[in-house]
Every structure is written in C-alpha cells, then in structure tokens.
Amino acid sequence: MTHQKRLSVPKSWKVGKKGNKWISTTRPGPHSQARSLPLGIIIRDILKLVDNSREGKRILSEGKVLVDGIPRKDLRFPVGLFDVITLPLVNEAYRMLQDEKGRLTLHKLNETNVNKLCRINNKTTVKGGKFQLNLNDGTNIIGSNEYGTKDSLILSIPDKQVVKHLKFEVGNLAMVVGGQHSGETGKIMEIREVKSSRHNTVMISGETDFETIEDYVIVIGEDKPEIRLGGEISE
C-alpha cells in the first residue's frame, strides 16, 4: 500500500494524529484524495472491523464490504461524500456525510436498503439526442434534458436508476459541503448569478441566514431531506 505521514493527511480526514507514523492514501478513483477516505482506514480505524491491513484485505476479498451496493476489494478505494457502505453479514449500513469542520463522518443508517444522493456537476450531449449526466461521485448516466446542472438525483443502488429528481432552485433544501458553513443545511432563498469570472452565490436560511458560493451547495430535498442526516456517528 502507498502511505503518507499521519500528520499530513487532508483536513477532511477525521483520524487521530496519534498512532502509526504512516497511514495509507486513497487510490485515484471517483473522489479526490482531499474529499475521500481510504476504505481500509474506514474498516480498521473507524468501524473497527479489523485490526490490521492483512485482515482488511481478507474481508474485502471475500466481498463482505459494499460501497454503493458493489463489493470493493481495494483497501485504498476512495469513499466520499454521500457514499453508502453496507455490511451484509451484520445487516448494517452507513452514509458518508460532512461535519461543520469539513471532516468526513460515517453516520449509521436505520436500514440497509437505501438510496444514494448525487449532484449533476455537468452534462454532455451524446448520440441519439440524449444527455450524459456527470455526477459528483464520478458516475456517468444517460438522462434527458430535463435534468439540469447542479440538480440532484436520488439513485437506487447498485443499478443507479433515478428514483427522484431534485431541482437546484429557490425553496428547496440544501447542504453546504465547503467553506466556513460546511455541513450546514437550510432552504435556498436566492440564487445570485454573477456576470463575471466570480462565482455565483446562494443565499441559504438555516439556523442562521448566510451566503455561500454555488459550487458548495448540494440540494438534498424539497420539503424535507431525501436522505437521513442524523444517526449514530462512527468515530
């Protein structure tokens, strides 16, 4: 495994500074290293399913850990925001969320038959007049022109069928995933388009009213969140 010094891990990694000097890195994949955790660290240091890398390799090779419904067998596989980890043998599931400090945290779910939330980062035209939707977790799916950039989709897993379409518009609920308001949720009150090289901004009303840049905002529901945001946090 490729390693880095524990003291130099990204700020989004909620791992202790004490322990082994070296810690594994993520492999290039659906999420960047700055916005994901290696699966090996999750099963060893957070869920405490194993004591070492050798045991981790064994349970992954046996298909006992699913990410978004797919068995993953690489200790360095990157697990990022909104990804769902399922442990079929113990009938448990967890969703990766972000806390107010921008750190990735695993929240235990009440059931294992859950869906996945994704944001449409951009879309491209493909043959037949259809559109390829490029999602925030690296997934690409074919959809129609009704789906807009910055909209969110609720997808079934592992087959990634659209269960619900959430528009990026005033009145819907959103989560902030970057900046000083990271981890906060609230209602979109205004979307301010800037006719310059500066970022578009969004006014959000939650526990307080605040403004953040558009790229940090992900729609999570209409009248209520479409995904469970609470639950026991694994540390």
From Swiss-Prot:
GO CC entries: cytosolic small ribosomal subunit
Domain S4 RNA-binding: 37-100
Cross-referenced HAMAP family: Ribosomal_eS4
Family: Belongs to the eukaryotic ribosomal protein eS4 family.
UniProt keyword annotation of rRNA-binding present: yes
InterPro entries from the UniProt entry: KOW (IPR005824), Rib_uL2_dom2 (IPR014722), Ribosomal_eS4 (IPR000876), Ribosomal_eS4_central_region (IPR013845), Ribosomal_eS4_central_sf (IPR038237), Ribosomal_eS4_KOW (IPR041982), Ribosomal_eS4_N (IPR013843), Ribosomal_eS4_N_CS (IPR018199)
SUPFAM superfamilies: Alpha-L RNA-binding motif
UniProt name for this protein: Small ribosomal subunit protein eS4
Sorted UniProt keywords: Ribonucleoprotein, Ribosomal protein, RNA-binding, rRNA-binding
Source species: Methanosarcina acetivorans (strain ATCC 35395 / DSM 2834 / JCM 12185 / C2A)
GO biological process: translation
Pfam families: Ribosomal_S4e, RS4NT
Top-level taxon of origin: Archaea
Gene name in the database record: rps4e
A single GO molecular function term of this UniProt record: RNA binding
